């Protein structure tokens, strides 16, 4: 059986919270911000949790996270 490896891209983008949920950053806030409203950029500022339907993919990408 091959070694289990953590996806390097996933370990840079996600953090596992103590309750077992996964924290992620919002998309659409890196560039082309001049055409976005201040309200839109403000709503994109905070971190959100990964949806429960995607938690299976998270467990595959982060096998040692205990998901």
UniProtKB/Swiss-Prot annotation:
Basic residues bias spans: 1-16
Superkingdom per UniProt: Bacteria
Alphabetical keyword list: Ribonucleoprotein, Ribosomal protein
GO cellular component: cytosolic large ribosomal subunit
Gene Ontology annotations of biological process type: translation
Single annotated GO MF: structural constituent of ribosome
Region of interest called Disordered, as start-end residue ranges on this chain: 1-24
InterPro entries (alphabetical): Ribosomal_bL35 (IPR001706), Ribosomal_bL35-like (IPR021137), Ribosomal_bL35_CS (IPR018265), Ribosomal_bL35_sf (IPR037229)
Ranges in coiled-coil conformation: none
Family, per entry: Belongs to the bacterial ribosomal protein bL35 family.
UniProt protein name: Large ribosomal subunit protein bL35
Organism in which the protein naturally occurs: Paracidovorax citrulli (strain AAC00-1) (Acidovorax citrulli)
Origin organism lineage: Bacteria, Pseudomonadati, Pseudomonadota, Betaproteobacteria, Burkholderiales
Gene that this polypeptide is encoded by: rpmI
